[in-house]
Amino acid sequence: KKKIKITYSGPSETDDVDDQVNILDEELARYPVALAISISDASACEVQFDLAAESGIPVVAYDSGSDYQGLMATVSTDNDASAREAAARLAEEMKEEGEVVIFAQDTKSKAAQIREAAFKEEITVNHPGITIVDAYHMDDLSSWQDVVAAEMNAGTYQPEDAALAGKETVLPEELTEEQVVDYIFAKHPNLKGVFGTNIDALKLGLAGVERAERDEISVVGYDIDTEMKKALKEGRVDGLIVQ
């Protein structure tokens, strides 16, 4: 009876595309009988997939795929339908009016792209009383650091964070992700909803809501763990899409 050996490999950071490509190269050099991958960047890995096809190695995408035509299969949640359901549930919690901010894990993965696009379309088409006022992507921190630092140095934004108080000049790289998130909430005093495209983005948005003490903001997002299950039970999160 033949035995199947499964090797698990992955980048230390889920959005580290270069690391994932390097790991993929290493695994292909071992000529596995098959390859399963959750693709961090929908536009990456095509060269590696071509090499796999040339070597007769079938590739199956899990959770987050790509438009590469040579994939044998993609196994994932219906990201479009589930994001639309999340939008409808959040709109219901918001009583069909108010402002929303999207927190997304990245700009590159297919799952994040589809979830964000479907959520936006559902809100725009079917919930006209709701406006999406911002979208924060966790792989775009540096751009936001530039924006926040520029406003602070111009005197148009004064954070409550004591660590930043009294500084004449703030460098972008000095700002933490939490401070950037606090800026987003401060800039949107009429915010009524937060949508998170995965558990990391969801937790980031929820933490911002709680630091700002904005109990009027409804929170809906993807994935569940012990912490999010507790938050749902306590009413700190209003809805979870569980895969």
Model regions: which residues?
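A residue-level marker of the well-folded mature domains of exported/periplasmic proteins
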Residues: 1-243
